[in-house]
């Protein structure tokens, strides 16, 4: 293996795993498992984030009455996940590789304790040669707390597990500099930090999934900013994973990772904006200090308002003097104490500078 990654996360999209009628493409699944098994036997730790449960279930059961979107997802995923994981179990067993099912929810990433509990579980699996197969637990997720799609979930998993690379497998070769349907368009091979891609990205989503290229790009940027290589490639290309790891010449998009290391807790905070329990509104002076070159904590004297109820260690949004969200941070106290000390000098920080991220 020419690319020196010891641990990778691989996300397989619904359009890779399903045929047009929604049934599982077992031939494609088998080919992907063969590739993952080859990498696993070469000593690479792999976490598989697999879509396909809802699409799989959709082809197995027909509702007796009209269901809303959440009820449909719960029904189809309950049936489809059993079918999906059973197929993975059988395919990996042919290679003598044990797998473990990890069903998670967005809520499980909202507190540091739950976050670390999940990380520990999957770390133990990897240490014992087990490949974790991760999916969202759609059967008990509610619409407002669902992941945008499994691209978002895979980004969280790659970050949480300190993966060196996240490979997102879709049904196109990567990000194009025009419409993928245009024969003149070409795949953008490398994307550096800060490169504007807005003119290239189409907002359409897949037939069986919730995600589109815009979501993939946003997740890829965030994960690459944490020092993790992100690759978007075509999961229907023969032996794509092995070819990527062998650094063979082929079309895919690679997001160049930041060279700066990011701490585990900052990785968690970077993905936690959607879990914020409250808001800290700060004045003009505090806002300017936060964006200066100095490492500055959020002190009570700079806080003008505390919105919502939160406990110590919860994630809170940081709102500037104009009402614009500028970041998130880990609260150093609960909301009652924050209100009590608000505007006062000589008090402990409400958010320490090490535990905040601006302009996420």
Regions found by a protein language model. Give the residues of each.
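C-terminal catalytic "cap/lid" subdomain
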Residues: 1-65, 70-98, 102-360
């Amino acid at each position: 293996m020419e690319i020196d990654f010891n641990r990778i996360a691989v996300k397989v999209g619904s359009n890779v795993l399903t045929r047009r009628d929604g049934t599982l493409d077992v031939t494609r699944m088998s080919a992907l498992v063969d590739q993952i098994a080859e990498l696993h036997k070469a000593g690479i730790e792999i976490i598989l984030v697999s879509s396909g449960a809802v699409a799989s279930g959709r082809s197995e059961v027909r509702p007796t009455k009209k269901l809303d979107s959440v009820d449909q997802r719960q029904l189809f995923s309950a049936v489809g996940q059993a079918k999906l994981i059973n197929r993975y179990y059988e395919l990996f067993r042919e290679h003598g590789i044990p797998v473990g099912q990890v069903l998670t929810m967005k809520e499980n990433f909202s507190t540091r304790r739950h976050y670390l509990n999940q990380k520990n579980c999957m770390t133990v699996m990897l240490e014992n040669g087990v490949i974790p197969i991760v999916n969202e637990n759609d059967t008990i997720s509610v619409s407002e707390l669902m992941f945008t799609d499994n691209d978002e979930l895979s980004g969280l998993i790659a970050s949480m597990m300190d993966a060196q690379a996240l490979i997102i497998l879709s049904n196109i070769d990567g990000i194009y500099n025009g419409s993928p349907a245009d024969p003149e368009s070409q795949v953008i091979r490398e994307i550096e930090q800060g490169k504007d891609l807005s003119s290239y990205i189409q907002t359409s989503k897949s037939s069986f999934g919730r995600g589109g290229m815009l979501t993939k790009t946003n997740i890829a940027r965030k994960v690459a900013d944490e020092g993790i290589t992100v690759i978007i490639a075509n999961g229907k290309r023969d032996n794509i994973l092995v070819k990527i790891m062998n650094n063979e010449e082929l079309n895919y998009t690679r997001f160049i990772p930041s060279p700066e290391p990011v701490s585990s807790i900052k990785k968690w905070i970077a993905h936690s904006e959607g879990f914020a329990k409250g808001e800290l509104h700060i004045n003009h002076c505090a806002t300017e200090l936060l964006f200066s070159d100095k490492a500055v904590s959020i002190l009570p004297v700079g806080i003008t308002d505390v919105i919502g109820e939160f406990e110590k260690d919860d994630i809170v949004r940081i709102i500037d003097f104009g009402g614009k969200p500028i970041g998130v941070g880990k609260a150093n106290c609960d909301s009652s104490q924050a209100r009590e000390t608000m505007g006062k000098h000589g008090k402990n920080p409400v958010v320490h500078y090490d535990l905040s991220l601006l302009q996420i």
